[in-house]
Amino acid sequence: MTEPLKPRIDFDGPLEVDQNPKFRAQQTFDENQAQNFAPATLDEAPEEEGQVEAVMDAALRPKRSLWRKMVMGGLALFGASVVGQGVQWTMNAWQTQDWVALGGCAAGALIIGAGVGSVVTEWRRLWRLRQRAHERDEARDLLHSHGTGKGRAFCEKLAQQAGIDQSHPALQRWYASIHETQNDREVVSLYAHLVQPVLDAQARREISRSAAESTLMIAVSPLALVDMAFIAWRNLRLINRIATLYGIELGYYSRLRLFKLVLLNIAFAGASELVREVGMDWMSQDLAARLSTRAAQGIGAGLLTARLGIKAMELCRPLPWIDDDKPRLGDFRRQLIGQVKETLQKGKTPSEK
């Protein structure tokens, strides 16, 4: 059967068409802009901690002021004057055969040379620490790159800096997994999932051990001054070990700068995460009623040590965090609580018997 035809519909007038359509202004691109064009992506809002760390990085970036330039120029002029005067004294002592003065000039030259060498060494180590931030930015760019040829050389440089031998099983698995058709993003991602976890696992063990030692020391020791000295020493040692694991050799000023960065990072971004990670679990388990005051203080000190280690790990790590592989305080919290409770139970058992 065929369906009946629908009747015709007559309209009173023509359809209304917008006589003034709104168009955006024409925008032309030159050849250079066309080659560097990248489509905009709608990403999720960055995390609060990332925003805070960006503000912190901007605040920590040194500003080249006029006074600083004047001080540096004065120091350079003073150094040149000292060197020139030393050369003149040496020439006069040689001409007059004043061997005592000549020996003093030689001793002064050795002292100045040692001082200059120390300054150069400290500057090189501090520069190496700053370069790690640039390497992290480069790795972040490679993780969003579709080019080829740079990822493998970059990862091999990171492995060499970390002291990973070519015969290491993780590095061998990475070599076996990459091939010529992969772009830089895939090569760096494979390195981040196959090789980088080896160093991260060692850093996690160092953080866990230092946090546990800090927790037990505070929970057992009755002397607050000893506790403070012990925590400071353990935290500095933890930072040194983490930096060494990631191939960074710290000098005096670079160690102070890293410690300053870690403390500022904790001050800017640590409070909210500490409350978020610890607060709910602390209240739900009613730890204040189960543990003594010293034990609670020990857990707090251990968590702060763990937080310091995590931020030192983040600043020394050559790659950004990928796929939520960043360690959290919750990873160390349960271990610290278990160790404190076990220690308290061992201490009570002999007295009860």
Swiss-Prot record:
The chain crosses the membrane at residues 70-90, 100-120, 213-233. Belongs to the UPF0283 family. This is UPF0283 membrane protein YcjF. InterPro entries: DUF697, UPF0283. The keyword Cell membrane applies. It is a multi-pass membrane protein. It comes from the Bacteria. It comes from Escherichia coli O139:H28 (strain E24377A / ETEC). GO terms for cellular component: plasma membrane. The keyword Nucleotide-binding does not apply. Signal peptide: none annotated. Keywords: Cell inner membrane, Cell membrane, Membrane, Transmembrane, Transmembrane helix. Its main location: membrane. It is found in: Cell inner membrane.
